[in-house]
């Protein structure tokens, strides 16, 4: 399975308008496309950064959808004030403990490794890091997206409420240090978001 992320910086005061556009215009459009298996949206109301992710059953379906989403991407650029940064990924891991409701928070960890090391990284993540993450307070789900050509990774860890994410902060930071060392991965950035749209229908992979 594959995913396309669209990252954009918005004026924090107009984020709700952007969310409404994605919910009411973009989501119905992409969900009607062949091979689409859902959409999610993360928003940082302080910085204005938003990430819209669409998931696809195959890489071919993702690429064939490109023509159809150009108009909606241009419309989003009008609302947000700039064109999004678009990246394509393989969804390597999807694991859910339970569904999320209103108020869920997601921490995204971007990193990189040697491209040829990706299979070892994913094996270590599944066998050692992920079981420890399940013990974190409020842990709801995690997904790991990778670009095998560049070695880039993006791990999204979702908690059911801001309070439980806060409770898990120290242990989560410890797991990042331990996990990145064990996986041979360099962490590039860590950021936190509200999970404002959660409609990914990606099947469990573990």
What are these regions, as identified by a protein language model?
Residues 1-51, 57-206:
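Short S/T/G/P-rich N-terminal loop/turn motif that feeds into the first structured element of a domain
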């Amino acid at each position: 399975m594959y995913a396309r992320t669209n990252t954009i910086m918005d004026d924090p005061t107009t984020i709700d308008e952007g969310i409404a556009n994605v919910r009411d215009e973009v989501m119905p459009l992409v969900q009607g496309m062949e091979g689409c298996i859902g959409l999610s949206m993360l928003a940082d109301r302080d910085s204005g950064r938003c990430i819209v992710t669409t998931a696809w059953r195959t890489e071919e379906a993702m690429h064939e959808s490109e023509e159809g989403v150009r108009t909606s991407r241009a419309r989003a650029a009008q609302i947000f004030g700039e064109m999004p940064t678009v990246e394509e990924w393989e969804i390597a891991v999807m694991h859910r403990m339970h569904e999320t409701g209103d108020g869920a928070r997601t921490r995204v960890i971007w990193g990189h490794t040697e491209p040829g090391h990706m299979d070892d990284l994913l094996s270590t993540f599944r066998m050692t890091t992920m079981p420890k993450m399940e013990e974190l307070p409020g842990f709801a789900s995690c997904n790991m997206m990778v670009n095998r050509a560049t070695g880039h990774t993006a791990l999204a860890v979702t908690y059911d409420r801001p309070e439980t994410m806060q409770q898990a902060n120290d242990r989560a930071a410890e797991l990042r240090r331990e996990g990145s060392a064990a996986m041979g991965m360099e962490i590039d950035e860590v950021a936190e978001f509200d999970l404002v749209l959660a409609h990914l229908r990606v099947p469990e992979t573990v």
